[in-house]
Amino acid sequence: MTKPIAKISLRKNARIGSNKNERRIPKGVIHVQASFNNTIVTVTDVRGRVVSWASAGTSGFRGTRKGTPYAAQAAAFNAIRTLVDQGMQRAEVMIKGPGLGRDAALRAIRRNGILLSFVRDVTPMPHNGCRPPKKRRV
């Protein structure tokens, strides 16, 4: 009977999260995606690997409260809280979407003591692309 060959990880890009607490990240990129229904804050390192993330839903808000500025502020605080302990000092901020949580999330990021290199609006704007949906009649 032949011996089974031990399988080494089949994933091309293995996860980095095994030594999360040991990694020091001095500079990162904070992505804020603010829709009308929710706000998602993702923190990556300079290479684009996700370090931490939070949303209004994971911060304990449900239903229509997820779209509020206060929920966006709580999501930004939860996403950045662990990174300040890991030593993040500088960050770039990319804001996407038309939601109410844009400014509130940015204010929460500024209050956490991280120096911002720049704040960039990366909301996708069509150059007269697809036809928009018809106007609602209420």
Swiss-Prot record:
The keyword Transmembrane does not apply. Pfam families: Ribosomal_S11. Coiled coil: none annotated. The keyword RNA-binding applies. It comes from the Eukaryota. Part of the 30S ribosomal subunit. This is Small ribosomal subunit protein uS11c. The gene is rps11.
